[in-house]
């Protein structure tokens, strides 16, 4: 099942990617070798026992051709998670400067394509220092495949003590083979993002994924984020691709001393979605807030695997994930907190709650703690259940219809996560997306 992608890589390496610097070509070669050795994961592996990727493994998804869909700025605004503001736009993983808008970014913020950033100069050195250093492509077949086909993506660098006051969006749009571009079958894109926020800087970044059409397509994304000493970052990730889309993602973050990362994950789209999220608190005093919400219906399947690695003492992490599952949807959550030897005075909390709106909906929740230090405060828990009948009765007794009462209770459950998101302007926009997903 890996052979077609090895052949595609050989063509990619000799044609479209031939102009890459030697260090990047070396990484790609190593990544395709690891993908070949690892193969696609199966349900026999513990980390994948609730999620089958057979629909991906048994289909040959090809790279999109050179033909591009015709999009206008108003189309992009409609597909954006924010609607307005500075943004980098990518179609099938390739940068589209004509659809992007970077006006108003302060001095000290560089936002461009990875293809441009890796070529030369200070940006090239930054990319070389960080790119493919954090995402686990040696151990993950999907991260390895993304790294092998690494040609373009988003590069955002916020210099030390710089304040990026307004949110910067990185928008990845996926086509769907024949439905949009005339390509001869289902296509795959490998979006890549590298976010570097230096010492003492402040930034809000939104990474959003949407489909241009509803045909069969696969997005295989990798994001690496570095949060420097004393920096503060709010990173929102919004996935609302089409119902015939497969979405596999790896999000890897590294935090330095006294840094803060608020990572907010919203999963609404895709037929099959898997998101591996790992954050390493690698400096004393680092703080992580990880919020997640998945709203699923039909036969959607979404699997979130999170790892919070407390590698240094006096760090804090608070993780809250809620899932709303209707019809035959299946939600999977696996949350792992690791407290390394010597990481004393760790403060960590993890909660996963799932709301089942039908008897056919299903949720599997596995919170885990691995503690190798003795002076820590760590808790975890999960719930799976139907609507709160007491709350429904209360609303019905005040004259609300059964449908309205259910809608209010369901929205209130989702709003628990939305309310934890820091920026009111972003929260308001995401609230609209969630309400539409619940309708």
State what each model feature region is.
Residues 21, 29, 34-37, 83, ...:
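Generic hydrophobic-segment detector
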Residues 122-400, 414-439:
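Conserved beta-strand/loop scaffold segments within soluble protein domains that form the structured core
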Residues 1-222, 229-232:
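Short, low-to-moderate order helix/coil transition modules at the start of elongated helical scaffolds
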